[in-house]
């Protein structure tokens, strides 16, 4: 397991130097943020990003993400051109020696929350999705701008995209378009040595009348069967899947591990119900997920991929520029998961490697 941390590039208020100081931190999860969606990522842009990260004593473990253009998701006539650009980006990521790309196939937005500062009993705040708060909201009729929406579209363009999904794209249509996309990009990913890792819908159920397809175990089974290759894998985001109480994330994790198709792990805890869900501290008792059981499975199956602590609470006056992505609680999460990993590794008679170089006072 390689502990990793999301970094939003040079404009992220959390610095690489701060991330490097987290015990056992090895990898950075980041992206090229200055290339418009649909265009190919130039190799030099990726290499420049890599040099920046490596100068801080870290390495890029995952690209998260190369966004998929809405015209690909909707199966528009120009999708082949856009897919060729996507394949070029994958090839260039491989040339840069970066092993994993996380992406999603969610219509319109990457994630949705109704509240960015919902209070927890311990006095901290976190991200929450309260169904009642959005029950009467229509993103087309209302002047709405929710977090996770793609800011590269104007409001008028966004409304047109949403209406097209509602009236012309069913869940089966979206599956067909995903199948087309996967079969087109996977030979390139295999040749480039890049493992693709699809992220689940967040939340993993229908909202605003839009189709949602990567939502639970049956969806994961269907997705992995689209293209049988280790390069066609998933991001096992336990917090996203557990946002639907019907999902058994421990069983789902073991299923995907048995198939050797977890290419990236996101670990955050949530408490969920018919009312929606709220993100919590990472500790097992704080939410619905037995985090020790998750990490034990990774050890049992000798999983060697990148893992990052997902969204954190806002604590100790942490920054608010990137909701859920402050330094402090994610750092606590990283040390917590490394602790679970070490305990389970030693219980299995194995020695964990956190990539730490130990120096004494006399070392130069």
Curated annotation (Swiss-Prot):
Q: Does the keyword Iron belong to this entry?
A: yes
Q: Which Gene3D superfamilies match?
A: Divalent-metal-dependent TIM barrel enzymes
GO terms in the biological process aspect are: D-glucuronate catabolic process
Query: Which keywords appear in this protein's UniProt record, sorted alphabetically?
Result: Iron, Lyase, Manganese
Q: Which reaction does it catalyse?
A: D-mannonate = 2-dehydro-3-deoxy-D-gluconate + H2O
**Which top-rank group of organisms is this from?**
Bacteria
**Cofactor(s) it depends on:** Fe(2+); Mn(2+)
Gene Ontology terms, MF aspect = ferrous iron binding; manganese ion binding; mannonate dehydratase activity
**Which EC number(s) are documented for this chain?**
4.2.1.8
- Please name the SUPFAM superfamilies in this protein's record: Xylose isomerase-like (SSF51658)
- Kindly tell me the pathway this chain contributes to: Carbohydrate metabolism; pentose and glucuronate interconversion
* Known function: Catalyzes the dehydration of D-mannonate.
In the record, the note on similarity to other proteins reads: Belongs to the mannonate dehydratase family.
Q: What is this protein called?
A: Mannonate dehydratase
> What species is given as this protein's source?
Streptococcus equi subsp. zooepidemicus (strain MGCS10565)
Instruction: Print the organism lineage.
Output: Bacteria, Bacillati, Bacillota, Bacilli, Lactobacillales
């Amino acid at each position: 397991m390689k502990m990793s941390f999301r970094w939003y590039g040079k404009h992220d208020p959390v610095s690489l130097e701060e991330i490097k100081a987290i015990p056992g931190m090895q990898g950075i999860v980041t992206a090229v943020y200055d290339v418009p969606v649909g265009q190919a990522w130039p190799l030099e842009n990726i290499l420049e990003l890599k040099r920046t990260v490596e100068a801080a004593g870290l390495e890029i473990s995952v690209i998260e993400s190369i966004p998929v253009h809405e015209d690909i998701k909707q199966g528009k006539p120009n999708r082949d051109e856009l897919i060729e650009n996507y394949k070029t980006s994958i090839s260039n990521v491989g040339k840069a020696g970066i092993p994993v790309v996380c992406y999603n196939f969610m219509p319109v937005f990457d994630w949705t929350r109704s509240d960015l500062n919902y209070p927890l009993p311990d006095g901290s705040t976190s991200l929450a999705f309260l169904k009642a708060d959005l029950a009467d909201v229509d993103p087309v009729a209302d002047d709405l701008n929710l977090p996770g929406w793609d800011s590269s579209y104007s409001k008028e363009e966004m409304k047109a995209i949403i209406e097209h999904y509602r009236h012309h794209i069913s869940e089966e249509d979206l599956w067909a378009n995903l199948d087309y996309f996967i079969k087109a990009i996977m030979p390139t990913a295999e040749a480039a040595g890049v493992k693709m890792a699809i992220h689940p819908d967040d939340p993993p159920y229908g909202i605003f009348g839009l189709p949602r397809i990567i939502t639970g175990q049956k969806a994961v089974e269907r997705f992995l069967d689209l293209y049988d290759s280790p390069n066609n894998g998933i991001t096992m985001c336990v917090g996203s899947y557990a946002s639907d109480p019907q999902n058994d994330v421990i069983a789902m994790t073991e299923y995907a591990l048995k198939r050797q198709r977890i290419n990236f792990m996101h670990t955050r805890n949530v408490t969920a119900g018919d009312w929606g869900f709220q993100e919590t501290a990472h500790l097992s008792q704080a939410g619905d997920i037995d985090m020790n059981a998750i990490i034990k499975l990774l050890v049992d199956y000798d999983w060697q991929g990148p893992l990052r602590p997902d969204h954190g609470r806002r604590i100790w006056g942490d920054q608010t520029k990137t909701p859920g992505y402050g330094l402090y609680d994610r750092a606590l999460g990283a040390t917590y998961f490394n602790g679970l990993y070490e305990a389970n590794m030693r219980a299995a008679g194995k020695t964990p490697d956190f990539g730490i170089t130990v120096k004494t006072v006399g070392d130069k």
